[in-house]
């Protein structure tokens, strides 16, 4: 009732956030597809493209910390105050983060970034998700990934109101196109534990990936937790 034109322009898209996190954790692409479908079917069309797509806020644990594990059981406050990711846990979470951010920036809606997520901040639930910004100690690889996706969103008009076209792919693989009159974009992510090959339309054959794995002919082969973003 809040999105009928006389109350709010947008709301925070927690259903997307939860489904994205579940997908990159478990590979449950069917659940993500169903969540996207429910939002597109039940929300006012004009509001869909204004939804605040986030993967972390001041009300949640930091996204890198969440993605370092398969659940949000971080213990009590005393335990969270001492919690620090090992290098192995951080790198594991970082790989998942790139997948989650790619979905955040390419699904219908507007990406809403919680300060510090683009710099690699970690932490448990409030107040441990509200630390100081790590000036001079940012994870530059993560920052550059966010910056590149931001530039691609500006460049590709299909992300700003374009049609969402889901693909039928094996469980664990999530793919879709965004289309408008002047542009098209293809996003495919493999969160399964097996290598997957996907045939793509002829129009993408000569295109290079703007982010992630490139095509070989008409075939896109993705190892576990690889992805691609192709823009026409």
What kind of region is each of these model predictions?
Residues 146-156:
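Amphipathic alpha-helical
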Residues 202-212:
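Solvent-exposed beta-hairpin/edge-strand motifs
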Residues 5, 53-85, 101-139:
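Aromatic/acidic polysaccharide-binding cleft in carbohydrate-active enzymes
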Residues 111-115, 157-163:
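Acidic/polar loop patches that form or flank catalytic/metal-binding clefts of enzymes
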């Amino acid at each position: 009732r809040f999105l009928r034109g006389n109350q709010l322009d947008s709301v925070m898209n927690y259903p997307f956030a939860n489904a994205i996190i579940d997908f990159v954790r478990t590979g449950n692409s069917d659940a993500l597809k169903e969540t996207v479908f429910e939002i597109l079917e039940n929300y006012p069309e004009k509001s869909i493209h204004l939804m605040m797509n986030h993967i972390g806020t001041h009300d949640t644990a930091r996204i890198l910390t969440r993605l370092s594990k398969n659940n949000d059981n971080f213990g009590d406050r005393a335990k969270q105050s001492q919690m620090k990711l090992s290098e192995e846990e951080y790198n594991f979470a970082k790989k998942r983060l790139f997948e989650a951010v790619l979905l955040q920036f390419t699904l219908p809606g507007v990406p809403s970034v919680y300060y510090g997520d683009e710099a690699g901040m970690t932490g448990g639930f409030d107040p441990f998700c509200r630390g100081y910004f790590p000036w001079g100690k940012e994870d530059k690889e993560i920052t550059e990934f966010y910056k590149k996706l931001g530039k691609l969103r500006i460049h590709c008009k299909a992300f700003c109101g374009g049609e969402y076209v889901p693909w039928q792919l094996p469980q664990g693989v999530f793919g879709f196109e965004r289309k408008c009159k002047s542009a098209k974009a293809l996003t495919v992510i493999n969160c399964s534990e097996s290598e997957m090959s996907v045939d793509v339309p002829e129009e993408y054959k000569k295109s290079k990936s703007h982010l992630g794995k490139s095509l070989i002919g008409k075939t896109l082969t993705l190892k576990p937790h690889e992805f691609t973003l192709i823009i026409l």
